[in-house]
């Protein structure tokens, strides 16, 4: 474990070391980490691409030799791969003409590759056609939904127009059409403090709606109790 991070509680002071009795002299103690390091230049060894070795080497010949070895290794492994591919890739009977069917004829890799290429091309074409069909169906569905939404919005707008105008809303029931032309009473017609600012003579004329400062004895309270409590 390193001791580099540990603090120095007792630093070295001159005159306190071994054989140091004069306090005026500086301390001769120093750390091993203060010693000079890497005092010698490191040169390339014999196996580390020294300049003398690089000058005497023929890199072109070495490259060509490595390429020949790689090609030889590749050709050595090819028969095994050809055998496995010929076994795994068998042509289908519906792709071979009837005149060429013979049990003694071996299946070559070229025929298998051509058949696999044709199969992959056919599969790709089928997938592209299916994708195009799906895109077309989605586009048609989107257009149909937009038309339905526009028709529904137009229908709602026309209904709002017809129902909002009482002169045009004459196609409903007779009672509703008759009631639509009748002026409705205000919601504050029978409140307690509606006509407080009017004169006393006017209030005396209306004995049924006389002003009473007690809410429990007012006409509004009586009507409310008779309507909702009794």
Curated annotation (Swiss-Prot):
This protein's UniProt keywords: Coiled coil, mRNA processing, mRNA splicing, Nucleus, Spliceosome
Keyword Coiled coil attached: yes
GO (cellular component) term, any one: nucleus
Domain of life from the UniProt record: Eukaryota
Comp. bias regions, Acidic residues: 102-124
Keyword Cell division included in the entry's annotation: no
Disordered: region residues: 1-126
Coiled-coil portions: 121-165
Subcellular localization, as worded in the UniProt entry: Nucleus
A single GO BP: mRNA splicing, via spliceosome
Transmembrane segment boundaries: none
Assembly behavior: Identified in the spliceosome C complex. Component of the minor spliceosome, which splices U12-type introns.
Functional note: Involved in pre-mRNA splicing as component of the spliceosome.
Protein name (Swiss-Prot/TrEMBL): Protein CWC15 homolog B
Organism: Xenopus laevis (African clawed frog)
Gene designation per UniProt: cwc15-b
């Amino acid at each position: 474990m390193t001791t580099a991070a540990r603090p120095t509680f007792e630093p070295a002071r001159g005159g306190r070391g071994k054989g140091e009795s004069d306090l005026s002299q500086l301390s001769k103690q120093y750390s091993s980490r203060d010693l000079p390091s890497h005092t010698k230049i490191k040169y390339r060894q014999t196996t580390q691409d020294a300049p003398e070795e690089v000058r005497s080497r023929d890199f072109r010949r070495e490259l060509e030799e490595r390429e020949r070895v790689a090609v030889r290794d590749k050709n050595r492994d090819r028969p095994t791969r050809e055998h496995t591919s010929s076994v795994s890739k068998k042509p289908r009977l519906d792709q071979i003409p009837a005149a060429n069917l013979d049990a003694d004829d071996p299946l070559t890799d070229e025929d298998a590759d051509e058949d696999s290429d044709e199969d992959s091309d056919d599969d790709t074409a089928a997938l592209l056609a299916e994708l195009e069909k799906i895109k077309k169906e989605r586009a048609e569905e989107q257009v149909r939904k937009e038309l339905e939404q526009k028709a529904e919005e137009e229908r709602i707008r026309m209904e709002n127009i017809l129902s909002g105008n009482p002169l045009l809303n004459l196609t409903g029931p007779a009672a509703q059409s008759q009631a639509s032309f009748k002026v409705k009473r205000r919601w504050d017609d029978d409140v307690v403090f509606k006509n407080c600012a009017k004169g006393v003579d006017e209030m005396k004329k209306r004995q049924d709606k006389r002003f009473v400062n007690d809410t429990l004895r007012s006409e509004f309270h009586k009507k409310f109790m008779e309507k909702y409590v009794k």
